[in-house]
C-alpha cells in the first residue's frame, strides 16, 4: 500500500554520544523506550508520517553517531537536511559544552535554512541535572533555536520536538523562505501535494486550449 503525504522532510538527530539520540528516535517512531540501546555506529535511519497544520508530512530521520571517530562519515549525511534535533544530556555538562561545534557543522554542511530545535534530553533525571533550563534557553535564544527538554524514557516532549521543527519548516514554505523545488532544500513534494499543484496547472492549460489562445 503506497503512502500518501504532502511533503517529505529530511531530518538529522545530532549531538554527543550517550545523549540518547537513538532512544529519542525510537520513542518517536515506536512509542516506547529502547532500553538495550548501544552507541550508534555510523548512521541509523527511521521514518514516520505526522500531521502538521492540516498537512501530512513524512519525516526521513538520520540518527548520526556522536563519537569523534565517525564524524567524517556522518558529516556526509548533513547535506540537504531541512531540520535537525540538536541533543544534549541535561546531566552532562560535557555534552552541553559541545553544542557549539555540532551547531557549526549543521549550519555549514546542511541546507542554508536548516531549522534546528535544541533538545535537553534525560529530563526524567532532574535530580542529577548539571545544565539548568535557563542557561540552555539562553543558548537557544542567542543562536536562534527552538528549545525543549525531553525524556526518551517517558516520552515527554519527544513527538512535540519533531512536530515543532516540522511546523516551522512548513511556515517557511508558506512564506516563500523555503522552496521545495530547490535542489538541496531537504524538502520534497509528496504525491498529495503534487496532485494539488498539477490540478490548477491542468485547469489552466485546458482553459487556454478552450479559448484558442
From Swiss-Prot:
Family annotation (PANTHER family): DRAB11-RELATED
This protein's UniProt keywords: Cytoplasm, Endosome, GTP-binding, Hydrolase, Lipoprotein, Magnesium, Membrane, Metal-binding, Methylation, Nucleotide-binding, Prenylation, Protein transport, Transport
Activity control, per UniProt: Regulated by guanine nucleotide exchange factors (GEFs) which promote the exchange of bound GDP for free GTP. Regulated by GTPase activating proteins (GAPs) which increase the GTP hydrolysis activity. Inhibited by GDP dissociation inhibitors (GDIs).
Free-text comment on this protein's domains from its UniProt entry: Switch 1, switch 2 and the interswitch regions are characteristic of Rab GTPases and mediate the interactions with Rab downstream effectors. The switch regions undergo conformational changes upon nucleotide binding which drives interaction with specific sets of effector proteins, with most effectors only binding to GTP-bound Rab.
Taxonomic path: Eukaryota, Metazoa, Chordata, Craniata, Vertebrata
Protein name as annotated: Ras-related protein Rab-4A
GO biological process: protein transport; Rab protein signal transduction; regulation of endocytosis; vasculature development; vesicle-mediated transport
A GO cellular component annotation in the UniProt record: recycling endosome
Source species: Danio rerio (Zebrafish)
